[in-house]
């Protein structure tokens, strides 16, 4: 019973991590696309250091979240206990999705709030990822409990 339930949580959290990574990637692509198209002071805003820096960090964090989700998935596929790894993947990917959506919205400026721009929907999608399949605080608790038990 309980072991089966925990295995279900592992799978669900890995799936949520994958979904969150997709949302993070979408936010990155939307931010990059808009930054290439938006002209300010006679040049695309992607050429401005702050915008380029945001995009670079979005790409780095998305890659890290993706790799952690892949790692947790491999552990699960190998029938190894991976509640800590699944929790880490879900926690990180959800935070990266939210951060990327927020940064992409910032790149869009006021246009990001307009429903014509998909980033407004991505922002909503990103927010819920920190809540379902265990809130971020629950994920942190699961991870800490595992670390204290010596499972790292």
Label for each model-derived stretch:
Residues 4-152:
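Alpha-helical interface subdomain recognition
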């Amino acid at each position: 019973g309980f072991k089966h339930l925990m295995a279900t949580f592992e799978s669900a959290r890995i799936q949520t991590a994958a979904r969150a990574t997709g949302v993070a990637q979408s936010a990155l692509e939307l931010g990059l696309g808009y930054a290439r198209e938006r002209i300010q002071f006679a040049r695309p805003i992607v050429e401005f250091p702050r915008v380029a820096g945001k995009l670079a960090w979005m790409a780095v964090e998305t890659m890290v979240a993706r790799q952690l989700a892949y790692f947790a998935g491999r552990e699960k596929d190998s029938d190894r206990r991976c509640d800590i790894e699944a929790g880490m993947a879900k926690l990180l990917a959800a935070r990266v999705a939210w951060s990327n959506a927020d940064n992409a919205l910032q790149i869009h400026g006021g246009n990001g709030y307009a429903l014509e721009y998909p980033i407004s929907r991505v922002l909503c999608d990103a927010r819920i990822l920190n809540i379902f399949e265990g809130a971020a605080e629950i994920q942190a608790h699961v991870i800490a409990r595992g670390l204290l038990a010596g499972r790292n």
